[in-house]
């Protein structure tokens, strides 16, 4: 212990020197975060004294202090000046809120909407400055995309285009992959992937010229399997991988690419319960009889109820997502990935660090909708259906035909399990 003071003091000296330099540059956030960081370093110092040799302790303390102070640095922002940004999907939600904020900051905003007479478009026209331009565009129509690209090139000829925000997205059904029509997968890919790809490729000449930014709103459903979001998640997974490629390939041009992965937020689409009910009825009406008999209408009804319950817990304040998009556009060194909202850390921890079985239990529909093994295709869970024994079972009849299982499902529905907390914002 006698040799300890020099590494401990040396580490604190390095931390103090870094903090002093940041203070002189007005580049250090003061207050509770700084106090918490100092408390963390003090606790780490105490542990290192007892567990590590001096040189290792010096390295650990100095590295931790450097990282912590880097996180406490005030983010350096670029001036707005006359920068122009194009945002897709501004009828409502994140796109609408981002367009309003960027316009208020002084950006020249090109906002695309599905309908120029939609409530969101009329709101933007009423509350924003004359710099904001509303453009009608359907990402599934190449003619619309070509028209918007041409308008953007002409409109930004003098100022240049600084940023593209790929925000537009679509999810149609909440159901197992087998239940979703193939057309649903194609539609999600057209809007969420190919639409963003066409917009990005079409505007890259302008973005390379300005060394600008590409910001894409994706979803955690593209990073890991989420129950009943196969079509949407598949398209977002492809989109995230594409943006990862762009991020590497555009580095020589100075173009920075960021992905936004929001938690569950209460956008206009989420709040429209009538829309989800219509889509559920549409799915039930179009399902082949064989699938409807194998899965049962009760299963789809329960999934829809769980989904709506999870959306009722969505975060009402969209500002974390809007702030993340703004930071990705203006930060001198934007992050590659932003995770606005609460609860994401736990989900990613379960998926990436816990045993694979934990992720399957938490993300499987079977964890929220136990089914009688005589009627359903899930693994045999005799303790969920006490009236039946394990073993092979025919795929016949809906769950309502089994009174024991029906009562058990109703009992388990009241517990709600984890799945309502695992559904994420999907727009």
Curated annotation (Swiss-Prot):
Tissues where the protein occurs: Highly expressed in the kidney and adrenal and at lower levels in the colon.
GO molecular function: 11-beta-hydroxysteroid dehydrogenase (NAD+) activity
Keywords, comma-separated and alphabetical: Endoplasmic reticulum, Lipid metabolism, Microsome, NAD, Oxidoreductase, Steroid metabolism
Originating organism: Ovis aries
Active site per database record: 232 (proton acceptor)
Gene: HSD11B2
Principal location listed in the UniProt entry: other
Protein name per its UniProtKB record: 11-beta-hydroxysteroid dehydrogenase type 2
Annotated substrate binding sites: 219
SUPFAM superfamilies linked: NAD(P)-binding Rossmann-fold domains
A single GO cellular-component term on record: endoplasmic reticulum
Keyword NAD: yes
């Amino acid at each position: 212990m006698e040799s300890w003071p020099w590494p401990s003091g040396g580490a604190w000296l390095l931390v103090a020197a870094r903090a002093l330099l940041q203070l002189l540059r007005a580049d250090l956030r003061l207050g509770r975060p700084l106090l918490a960081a100092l408390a963390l370093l003090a606790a780490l110092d105490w542990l290192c004294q007892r567990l590590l040799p001096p040189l290792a302790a010096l390295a650990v303390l100095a590295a931790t202090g450097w990282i912590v102070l880097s996180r406490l640095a005030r983010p350096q922002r670029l001036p707005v000046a006359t920068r122009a940004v194009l945002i897709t999907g501004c009828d409502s939600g994140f796109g609408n809120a981002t367009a309003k904020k960027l316009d208020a900051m002084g950006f020249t905003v090109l906002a695309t909407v599905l309908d120029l007479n939609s409530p969101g478009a009329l709101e933007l026209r009423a509350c924003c400055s004359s710099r904001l331009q509303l453009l009608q565009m359907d990402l599934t129509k190449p003619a619309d995309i070509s028209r918007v690209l041409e308008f953007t090139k002409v409109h930004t000829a003098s100022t240049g285009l600084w940023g593209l925000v790929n925000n537009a997205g679509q999810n149609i059904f909440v159901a197992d992959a087998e239940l979703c029509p193939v057309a649903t997968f194609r539609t999600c890919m057209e809007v969420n992937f190919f639409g963003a790809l066409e917009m990005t490729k079409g505007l890259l000449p302008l973005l390379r010229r300005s060394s600008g930014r590409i910001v894409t709103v994706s979803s955690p459903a593209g990073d890991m399997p989420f129950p009943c979001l196969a079509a949407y998640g598949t398209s977002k997974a492809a989109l995230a991988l594409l943006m990862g490629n762009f991020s590497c390939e555009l580095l020589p041009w100075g173009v920075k690419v960021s992905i936004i992965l929001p938690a569950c937020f209460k956008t206009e689409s989420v709040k429209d319960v009538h829309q989800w009910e219509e889509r559920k009825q549409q799915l039930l009406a179009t399902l082949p009889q064989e699938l409807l008999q194998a899965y049962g209408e009760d299963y789809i009804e329960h999934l829809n109820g769980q989904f709506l319950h999870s959306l009722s817990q969505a975060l009402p304040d969209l500002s974390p997502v809007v702030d993340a998009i703004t930071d990705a556009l203006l930060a001198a060194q934007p992050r590659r990935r932003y995770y606005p909202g609460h609860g994401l850390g736990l989900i990613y921890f379960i998926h990436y660090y816990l045993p694979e079985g934990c992720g399957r239990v938490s993300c499987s529909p079977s964890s929220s909708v136990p089914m009688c093994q005589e009627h359903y295709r899930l693994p045999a869970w005799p303790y969920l259906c006490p009236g039946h024994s394990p073993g092979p079972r025919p795929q016949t009849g809906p769950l309502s035909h089994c009174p024991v299982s029906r009562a058990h499902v109703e009992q388990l529905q009241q517990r709600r399990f984890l799945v309502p907390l695992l559904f994420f914002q999907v727009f």
